[in-house]
Each structure stands twice: as C-alpha cells, then as structure tokens.
Amino acid sequence: MIDVNEIEVVVCGEEHVKYIDEILKTMSDAAKVRGTGIAKRTHEYVEKVMREHKAVLALYHGRFAGFSYIESWSHRLFVTNSGLIVHPDFRGIGLASRIKRRVFALARQRYPLAKVFSLTTGAAVLNMNTKLGFKPVTFEALTSDKQFWKGCESCVNFDILQRNGGQKCLCTALLWDPAEHLDEQPVIEEKMDNQKKEIKREKVVLAYSGGLDTSFAVKYLTECGY
C-alpha cells in the first residue's frame, strides 16, 4: 500500500503543465463512473491557473496523483476551491484530505479577506469542507459573477439549475466566511514547496484624498502581499 506521506502536494507552476491531459482525463473518467455532474475544464484554463500558481498538484515520485485549484470571483470578494480529483491508484489513503487542506490554505493565503465557497455533489468533499469550518448555504449566498455560473453550463445537470432559476441544483453549496473566523490567521499547514517562486502582481497606486478613509484598502492590499 502506498504511504500518503511519500506523496508531495505542491503549488503548481509552469513545469507542471505536462500533467494537464492526465488531469482532465481523470476528471472525465470520474464523472462517468459517478454518474453525477462535474463541470468540464479546458486545457487552456487549467494551464492558466497552473501558471498563475492557483493550483495544487499531488505527485508520487513524479506520477500524477491528485489536483485541485482556486479562482477568485466578484472582484476577489469570493474564491472557490474547485476541481478536486484523485487518481484511482491513490484513492482510499487520505490524499484527498491533504489536497483539500493545501488548496484551502492557498485560497486563504492569496485572498485572505475573501469568502471561500465550494459546490459539490460528493459526500466526501462535503465532509472535508465541514471539518474545515464550511457551512451549507443557499445559492443566493454565493457569488453573482456570471463567469462563474457560466462554468456550470458544461455540467450534465445544468438543466436542473436552469429550471430552478439558478437557485437550486444537485450540488450542495458550502461557504467559509472569514468574518466568522476573525481570531484565525491564514495558516499554511504544510510548507509551500515552491514558495520562493515569484508571483507576478499588477502595480497598485493608492491615492489619498482628504475626508476619505482609505485605511481599509491599505490593510487589504497588505494582506494580499502588495
């Protein structure tokens, strides 16, 4: 039996693009076996989140073992933990939980003030999210960003979402609100293996104006690493 501790869970970079085809095939195969909806991701999109260091990859001596990624919505007010998948050869050893903790830590590190949410039909993912402090919510509590919901169009259950006016589907909505965890700091449970890699950021110019309190903006930008 494979020892889960021998599996690396790293933040993705350009060097991991070579694993994309296997990641997408594993996702597609899982959707067929489960018979439930999984939104399809394109090669271009997965490459984008990898190059932007918004994804985590599990590797066993160079072999693909698992994957997940984050994405921000509504001007960084929300961030998703999405696409969690474990290769069949590495299931049942606790790897999914390790990936989930790492991708949640990445979301908190990159977007410390954002609400983190997840949509899932899987009991295992629901259980992992609950242990991290996520709570079930209605779809109304999630982002209204049209680009996010457009991603659901590739799911086999999209017609159910449409029939319910975008307010109900087979997925359970789970939300982690930082306002309910003010005493908790963003903690990275495991050392980021490629933490030293430089993440390119846009330049931000903050102009002060008399009578306008911009202290909240300074705090936000500082926490985001600017």
Annotate each predicted stretch with a short phrase:
Residues 1-5, 108-192:
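Terminal substrate-recognition subdomain of acyl/acetyltransferases
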Residues 24-88:
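A conserved beta-strand-loop-helix scaffold within acyl/acetyltransferase catalytic domains
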Residues 86, 92-107:
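Conserved acetyl-CoA-binding loop-helix of GNAT-fold acetyltransferases
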Residues 87-89, 93, 123, 210:
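Active-site acidic-Proline motif in GNAT/NAT acetyltransferases
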Residues 193-226:
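ATP-dependent adenylation/nucleotidyltransferase module used to activate substrates
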